[in-house]
Amino acid sequence: SGCALRTDVRRSTVMRRLAWDAPEVNEEWNCDKGRFAFPYTSEGRLTHPLVRDSDGNLVPTSWPEAIRIAAAGLAATGSATGVLTGGRVTVEDAKAYSVFAREVLGTNDVDFRARAVSDEETAFLANHVASKPLDVTYGDLETAKSVLLVAFEPEDESPIVFLRLRKAALKGNTKVYAIAPYTSAGLAKMKGTLLTAGPREEVAAITNAAAHLTSDSVILVGERAGQTPGALFAVAELAQKTGARLAWVPRRAGDRGALDSGLLPIGGRSTSEILAAAGKCVKGLLIGGVSPEDLEGDLVAAVESATFVVSLETRHTEVTANADVVFP
């Protein structure tokens, strides 16, 4: 999910962010998050490549020198390198990371998920989402007979989806159901129906939701479902049983593009496994735009343990503070 935006710049200064001319996506409207929630224009951005000198300090250097040092270090770690990209890179960058990791470094230890992950989620994404057509559009949400929300809060996680569902519900076109422990403010605004499910009750609630779905329905499942054992498999089975269309809605804008570009660790280690193996089986780390806050203390500990670390970032973090080479 996401919206089409344009950024107006004058004299190297961002003046405003407006909805792009793509009415089929966001009807020429963009949410407050899209308009204001971006930090890349704030002060403190990195402007030059940095390398660690003989005294252990990060110092500015030229691009050719930084590339030379990074290439030598990654060549040394080779297939024992883990690649973590985060979910905010473009499709083109995601593809470049994937090809570089698998064909140049010779590693399958790649993952775009900057959060807690599970084997069930990996299998679900590989079998039911990756390389599948995007057959659920924003317009489809307004014409669906019913929409089931599983581990997904549209108002908080995807305001454009919320706007469409609220619009459809107020017109009486679509009935919204949500599997959750309580009725959220967003669900109330969509005149939705709560299918109550407390801890360890989600899988049963998903199975029982079949009574509210038909082939004209849509199931929207959020990334939080991956933290409930059995939930994603139950969702896939529900979609197959009812004929409802299924859409996975992650929180980060680049997650789906990264998934389709090959940044799921098929045959390799997941994010949590890469971090746990840092300094052991995983000697090197290539990290692109993953914030320490996303993975609490695990990421910093892994960076400190690794033999060689390359970081691509917009500004200094605890990752860049411990990296051997930093690219802005």
Predicted regions mapped to residue ranges:
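Catalytic alpha/large subunits of respiratory electron-transfer oxidoreductases
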Residues: 1-328
